[in-house]
Design a protein with these regions (language model features):
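N-terminal glycine-rich phosphate-binding loop and ensuing alpha1 helix
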Residues: 1-59
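Hydrophobic helical membrane-anchoring modules
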Residues: 206-225
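Structural beta-sheet core signal
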Residues: 5-7, 52, 104, 129-132
Length: 225
């Protein structure tokens, strides 16, 4: 069964703060964040296509700056769109017709492991749709105007991660039915389309770098691993 990997790297990194580079392109312990996010897929024999979406004005810069890994891994660099879903859609349009499964992964999740990739791929083969996630452990409060209005039961709540992996026809149909629906990930689109999404329990260390504190934590976890 053939898999395509889509790395989403076209975001604005607005919550990360002032840096010369966007967070996927920063050096993290000797490697760019996006390449660390990709590496666990490279050991999967069924991965036959790799695409990364970047901002249109960064396409040439990306290909030039990261020429060695782009060439070595035959990475297709796709111009992104105005929003994340537009960027992923552009990449989906470029997926080879012989691909059976598509994995969408945040380029800012550099601590993904090959073990998690393998587990999610296996679940997608069985269920058609699968994501990694970890259980919510903190107490959650619903707050309105600075006041707690509800303590939210957390027993059935999970933090969704990526790579979110789907049978090709399922993901494409879910995207086709989006109609500007404000989903926050691919799994929500697939749920809305009507196909159940299987959850693979994975460690919380598969974090997404959103702030500089997240980056510092990723550095610490890599140094201590």
């Amino acid at each position: 069964m053939s898999f395509a990997v889509v790395l989403a790297a076209a975001g604005r990194s607005s919550r990360f703060g002032e840096t010369k580079l966007k967070k996927p392109f920063l050096d993290l312990a000797g490697q760019p964040v996006w390449l660390r996010a990709l590496t666990p897929f490279l050991s999967q024999p069924d991965v036959s296509q790799i695409l990364i979406s970047v901002s249109p004005d960064e396409v040439d810069w990306f290909i030039s700056t990261f020429a060695n890994p782009v060439e070595e891994h035959s990475i297709q660099v796709i111009p992104g769109g105005a929003e994340r879903f537009d960027s992923v859609q552009n990449a989906l349009n470029a997926v080879s017709p012989n691909i059976e499964y598509i994995a969408v992964h945040d380029a800012a999740r550099p601590l993904l492991t090959a073990e998690v990739v393998e587990q999610v791929f296996d679940a997608a083969r069985i269920h058609g749709a699968a994501i990694p996630a970890h259980r919510v452990v903190n107490t959650l409060k619903r707050v309105v105007d600075g006041q707690i209005v509800e303590t939210v039961p957390r027993e059935d709540l999970w933090n969704a991660q990526t790579p979110q992996t789907f049978r090709r026809d399922i993901l494409l149909a879910a995207y086709a039915a989006r109609n500007e629906f404000p989903a926050t990930d691919e799994a929500q689109l697939v749920e809305r389309w009507g196909h159940p999404v299987h959850v693979v329990e994975c460690p919380s260390t598969n974090l997404k770098i959103t702030t500089q504190a997240d980056f510092a934590l990723a550095e610490h976890l890599l140094a201590s691993s």
